[in-house]
UniProtKB/Swiss-Prot annotation:
The protein, known as: Protein YIPF5
Membrane topology designation: Multi-pass membrane protein
UniProt keyword Phosphoprotein, yes or no: no
Pfam families according to UniProt: Yip1
High-level lineage: Eukaryota, Metazoa, Chordata, Craniata, Vertebrata
Positions on the Lumenal side per record topology: 146, 195-196
Organism (species): Macaca fascicularis (Crab-eating macaque)
Topological domain spans for side Cytoplasmic: 1-124, 168-173, 218-236
Gene: YIPF5
Amino acid sequence: MSGFENLNTDFYQTSYSIDDQSQQSYDYGGSGGPYSKQYAGYDYSQQGRFVPPDMMQPQQPYTGQIYQPTQAYTPASPQPFYGNSFEDEPPLLEELGINFDHIWQKTLTVLHPLKVADGSIMNETDLAGPMVFCLAFGATLLLAGKIQFGYVYGISAIGCLGMFCLLNLMSMTGVSFGCVASVLGYCLLPMILLSSFAVIFSLQGMVGIILTAGIIGWCSFSASKIFISALAMEGQQLLVAYPCALLYGVFALISVF
């Protein structure tokens, strides 16, 4: 033990004191600490000047009852973003341009060739009805064993483009491509009847030829009547009916053969 005490005494320096080390390590708040010069002059009470003035206002006490809130706490009704409520917005079908009343009137105009066509309604660009009639025409051809959807759409596009160019040359007001496609599509309705007859019996006999000629005349007369009333082309119905008859004659050939 005497040797161990001598060893510990020799290990520490003569000027080193454990009491001085503990005082130097833990006395951070005193004036003699190593950090006293850096942090002693900082005033923590200065943080209050950065608080916004609105946050320092005292809150008003709630004077109402729990089950009967005052008017100040009544939530306001949300304001609409677009200025109008949802009840005032038009229906989705009207925004898409689908009007069942106009579709029905155009269909009746085609089914009654002698009926006077309304030019204001017929001048609209409505492609909902023509698309339905084109699909119905292709479906009836499919029932007859003729997969001709590509021919139907291709001939329809070429025919609409040709009639669009022709009517713009003949009329003074001009016409849009959508209006031409709409009228020609609606007048395809009698051709659906012809393709439906082809499902039941053959149209390659004399009866079929007469029926086919009547359907072609029906379609071309209805289309020319609508174009004349919509574009104010009085006295030119035969000139418009001839190219329409050529177009619907191609559809009739697809139905017969």
